[in-house]
């Protein structure tokens, strides 16, 4: 079982109740017009207040909370953060990746999962570019 949430406090409390449940931390640092971000200084979504410089290293925070999956908005991810997440044993999943160049970039970054509105498109891109990602 994997439970994911934007609210780190819920995931932290869940760990105390049942440490065997896998927990995924959903993050959004760049505000979208339709969605409010949850990662910012003094965010009520976080377990505690983190200094701004730590918020750029979310895999460190998720690891410290003994998370299992980092699920982030694809525009917030960097190759370095994916590598850091993997170093901590975290799977990385990005959302909502729909454009070809973004899909290819996420695969090149080494993410473990892509959430998209067009799964067939991801398959076709991988096949056309001879990328064995599945």
Predicted regions and their residues:
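Short loop-to-alpha-helix "cap/lid" segments that border enzyme active sites
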Residues: 1-134
